[in-house]
Amino acid sequence: MSLTDKTCVPCQGGVAPMDRQQAEQMLVQVPEWSLDTDARMIYRRFKFRNFIDALSFVNRVTEVAEAEDHHPDILLGYGYAEVRIQTHKIEGLHENDFILAAKVDALGA
């Protein structure tokens, strides 16, 4: 089953975050994303022609995030939006983060 076919499940905490090796294995499924140096977050910078296009993309990401009840951090500027995803409750990465990344990718930039 592909990540886009899955649904984020609520994380109640008490679950260990993925280690670097697990995260790198999951990253293969969302190859445009990068792992931060601590392996606690994935991120991707999307480029656009202008601010309006970037904002439109962020609004579409918001709809997906609300539907999945999993919310990324987003940096927005002229011609770009950077999406950063982690599971805050466990201060690291969970399968949910990669599911959301795949669904953001499916929006097309």
Swiss-Prot record:
Is the keyword Metal-binding in the record? Answer: no
At the top level, the lineage of the source is: Bacteria
Task: Tell me which SUPFAM superfamilies the record gives.
Answer: PCD-like
Reactions catalysed, semicolon-separated, are: (4aS,6R)-4a-hydroxy-L-erythro-5,6,7,8-tetrahydrobiopterin = (6R)-L-erythro-6,7-dihydrobiopterin + H2O
State the InterPro entries in the record.
PCD_sf, Pterin_deHydtase
What's the top EC group for this one? lyase
- Which GO molecular function, any one, fits this protein according to its record? 4-alpha-hydroxytetrahydrobiopterin dehydratase activity
What GO biological process terms does the UniProt entry carry, in alphabetical order? tetrahydrobiopterin biosynthetic process
Q: Which UniProt keywords apply?
A: Lyase
**E.C. designation(s):** 4.2.1.96
PANTHER family recorded for this chain?
PTERIN-4-ALPHA-CARBINOLAMINE DEHYDRATASE
Q: Which family does it belong to?
A: Belongs to the pterin-4-alpha-carbinolamine dehydratase family.
Q: What is this protein called?
A: Putative pterin-4-alpha-carbinolamine dehydratase
Organism of derivation: Halorhodospira halophila (strain DSM 244 / SL1) (Ectothiorhodospira halophila (strain DSM 244 / SL1))
Please spell out the taxonomic lineage of the organism that makes this protein. Bacteria, Pseudomonadati, Pseudomonadota, Gammaproteobacteria, Chromatiales
